[in-house]
Amino acid sequence: MYRLAAFDMDGTLLTPDHRVGPETLAVLKQLVEREMVVTFATGRHYLDAQPIMAQLGLQGYLITGNGTRVYDDRGQQLQATDLPADIAEEVLHTHWHTDASMHVFRDEGWMTEFAVPEEMLRAHHLSGFHYQLTELRRLPAFGNSKVCFAGPHEELLKLQVQLRRHFAARVDLCFSAYECLEVLPLGCNKGSALDMLSRHLGLKMAECMAFGDAMNDKEMLATVGHGVVMGNALPQLKSLLPQLQVIGHCEQQAVAHYLQHWLRSPYLTYSPEL
């Protein structure tokens, strides 16, 4: 029997308009009533994710910044991982041949140099989380959890080649969304963060289930006892984890539908969405 459920937020738990549907909210509360540990694992900043949970009346553990931060259910930070100072310095000061915009995440917030398009801000309407305009090269080299590049996917694929050539195996690169490429501390991902959290709680990864849709969910989905892939997941994720169940679309609150079946039949081995 699984004792912890971990959920990606955007594209998984949230609908395309970045809201939590009523069925999803109800099933999350059912899990809490069953004394399951509920964990939200997201690329979002803590200052973005926590207000969403508070508004919904949810209390759970938080993995934020794609594994760079871990918080307990009272909001106490359990683990923090930053880019090494020399690497952060190189990311911020190297001239990358790209039109993608650069965004830096620190405990104090989201930093960028230019105004962010309104469509990017829609994802943060529930929390009110907003960027801070600053000259990125003036940021301290210490305390930078991750750097995100936003732009068209084809542009980011070219940038990914540059970053791999420059850093080799000194960082992890990950597509957290089709139009978002992230530079993360080496070995830092949702899977490693969930492993740390599960050990903190006295659990094994085999006792955890997880849901996700993007490449930043790959390690988490691959290492838990039961990983579930969204129907709207990136094709790369589905091809890399062909052994995992695929359920419906986040627009139809597929996580809620799946869990409603699972709560009635915990040993369910097929997807009720298909």
Curated annotation (Swiss-Prot):
Metal-binding keyword on record: yes
Annotated keywords: Hydrolase, Magnesium, Metal-binding
Binding site for Mg(2+): 8, 10, 213
InterPro entries in alphabetical order: Cof, HAD-like_sf, HAD-SF_hydro_IIB, HAD_sf, HMP-PP_phosphatase
Substrates-to-products reaction catalysed: 4-amino-2-methyl-5-(diphosphooxymethyl)pyrimidine + H2O = 4-amino-2-methyl-5-(phosphooxymethyl)pyrimidine + phosphate + H(+)
Enzyme category, top tier: hydrolase
Range of residues in the leader sequence: none
Pfam families: Hydrolase_3
Xref: NCBIfam families: Cof-subfamily, HAD-SF-IIB, PRK15126.1
Role: Catalyzes the hydrolysis of 4-amino-2-methyl-5-hydroxymethylpyrimidine pyrophosphate (HMP-PP) to 4-amino-2-methyl-5-hydroxymethylpyrimidine phosphate (HMP-P).
Cofactor needs: Mg(2+)
Active site per database record: 8
Top-level lineage group: Bacteria
HAMAP family registered for this protein in UniProt: HMP_PP_phosphat (MF_01847)
Coiled coil, from the record: none
GO molecular function terms noted in the UniProt entry: 4-amino-5-hydroxymethyl-2-methylpyrimidine diphosphatase activity; magnesium ion binding; phosphatase activity
Native organism: Serratia proteamaculans (strain 568)
Similarity comment: Belongs to the HAD-like hydrolase superfamily. Cof family.
Protein name: HMP-PP phosphatase
E.C. designation(s): 3.6.1.-
Gene: cof
Record carries keyword Metal-binding: yes
